[in-house]
Amino acid sequence: MNAYNLDYSKLIHVFQNKFRKNVKILVRFHPNVDSSFINLQDTDCINVSTYSNPQDLMMSADVMITDYSSASIDFMLLNRPVFLYLPDYQSYVNDRPLDDNFDKLPFPRAYHNNELTEIIRDFERSKYDEKVRLYELEDVRFDRGKASVQCANWIEEK
């Protein structure tokens, strides 16, 4: 294990078994973390922390594993799975309040490496999609870029 205490070899194995694809893991550290000294050791893990455009990285990814980052919502808009890995959850919530909406996020959560590999192994896309759909309906702040069309339709109805 290394960066973020993730067992990258185990993750690669479980992703390859689950999705039947060759896997590369792109690792992007928080901007406040000096990632230049971190050696990921696995040739299938690539440190992309210095890549300037996170949107490009999201477009090239099939799945996201993140923690408390709002990037999870951006990635959800791409209709791709997000998994939350929260090994420091207890200390994190003791140090700072989470957004009220965090507990409502529809993403599978893991607090340990073994849990993370289990939720990936047991992942069912249809159940995940339904949770995301219900979240989108419930969260009135959520927008899929159709606000102008919806507004015009509302005006026409009046």
List PLM regions with ranges:
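Catalytic binding pocket for nucleotide-activated donors in carbohydrate/polymer assembly enzymes
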Residues: N39-Q41, S70-V140
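C-terminal alpha-helical cap of glycosyltransferases
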Residues: R144-K158
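Alpha-helical elements of Rossmann-like donor-binding domains used by nucleotide-donor carbohydrate transfer enzymes
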Residues: K10, V14, E115-E118, Q150, ...
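Soluble or luminal CAZymes and related metallo-dependent hydrolases
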Residues: A3-L11, N53, D143, A147
